[in-house]
Every structure is written in structure tokens, then in C-alpha cells.
Amino acid sequence: MMRAGGLLKLGVLVSVLFVAVFLAFELLESNMNFNLGKVFTRYAPPDAVPTRPLRHKCGLSKSCPEDHFAFKITSGAASVVGPKMCFQDNVIMSGVKNNIGRGINIALLNGKTGELTKTDSFDMWTGDVNLLIKFLKDIEDGSIVMMATFDDPATKMNDEARNLIADLGSSSISILGFRDNWVFVGGKGIKTKSPFEQHIKNNAETNKYEGWPEVLEMEGCIPIKHD
């Protein structure tokens, strides 16, 4: 009986020792895998490390060619949210910058350097259209002209002002009406109509907001003026 009891104790001791050794090896292997994982992650080649999505200037969907300026322009939303203009990754007009107003908002930039030269807004509901006309006449040749509407852009607009804007490359200025939304990028001295223009009519049946159409957003790449 004593011999049998001793053998039983010995068997239990061997089993416990075996389990302890097994667990020790398991723990060691787990630590080695963890450490090796850290090492391989640290020294992984660049293409194996996740990267952030590439961001383009002004949040454009793709980068502009090297000899172009990037821009994005958004019209106002009803009479609540004003327009926003971005040029070469710099916001040049917005509500936050406090340089926008009801009517037509305009930014002028140097066509060679991209330097912002002037911004202004003209109230076309109760304002004086002659102020807009003078501003348009004073634009220097070679200037990039960005325009965006807010609230009402057309009540005070007359033929002289429309013709001056058409000379900047606009195709839609002749039909711009009460509370229409419109965004445009043209230039002083342009020889053709600008490809950068969007216009949406104020229509009670299709308006997104009560009394106003939906917001317009336009982006693009403007060739740098070299001559």
C-alpha cells in the first residue's frame, strides 16, 4: 500500500512538473512572438506601413499640374451661409475671414504669381451698382477674377455691369436672375469664354432651400500666366 501511495504521489508530481514546464514554454513562445512582431513592425519597409490619404491643395479631388493654380469656390447657401473661396490652399474669402457680403463677392489675383491683390463684395439688393462697375473697370490686365453669389446677385445688376463681367469670360451673366446661385472664375484680357462657371436658377419647384436654389461648388486648375 505504501509503495502504491508513493508511486501515486510521484505520478502527480511528475504531472505537475510537466504542466509547469509546458506552460513556461508557452509563455516564452508568446513573448518571443510579441517581441518579434514589434521588431518586424519597427523595421518594416515603407510600403508596408499604412499611410494617410494624399491631400491636395484646397481639398481638390486630384492635384493640379505643376504650372497651374488650384482653386475651389462655393456659392452662398440661401441668405444664411456665405460663399467661400480657396486659392492655392489658402482661404481668401469666407464668413470666418469676415470679408464677404450679400450680392456678388469678388477676389482678384495676379495671374503670374497667384498673389491676392483685392477682395470686395457688392450688394445687389439695395446697393449701388456703380460701385461694382467702377471695380470691374479698374481690374488690371492679367488678373484672375473669382466671383461667387450670396443671397440676391441680380436685382440692381444692369447691362453695363453684365457686359463687363462677360468680357471677363462669363457665359451665364446675361441670364443671372433674382436669388440665382452662380460661381465663376475668369480673367481680365481673356480671349475666350471661361470653362470655370456654374449657374443654377431660382425655381420654386426645384429649389433646395425655401426661396433659394442649392449651393454650387466648383474646383479646378488655372494655367499660370507666363507672357
Swiss-Prot record:
Signal peptide segment: 1-30
Gene Ontology MF terms: carbohydrate binding
Location(s), subcellular: Secreted
Coarse class of the protein's main subcellular location: secreted
Source superkingdom: Eukaryota
One GO CC term on file: extracellular space
Disulfide bonds: C58-C86, C64-C221
GG-type lectin domain segment(s): 67-225
InterPro entries per record: FAM3, ILEI/PANDER_dom, ILEI_FAM3C
Annotated transmembrane regions: none
Keywords, in A-Z order: Developmental protein, Disulfide bond, Lectin, Secreted, Signal
Protein family according to the UniProt entry: Belongs to the FAM3 family.
UniProt function note: Involved in retinal laminar formation.
Official protein name in the record: Protein FAM3C
Protein source organism: Danio rerio
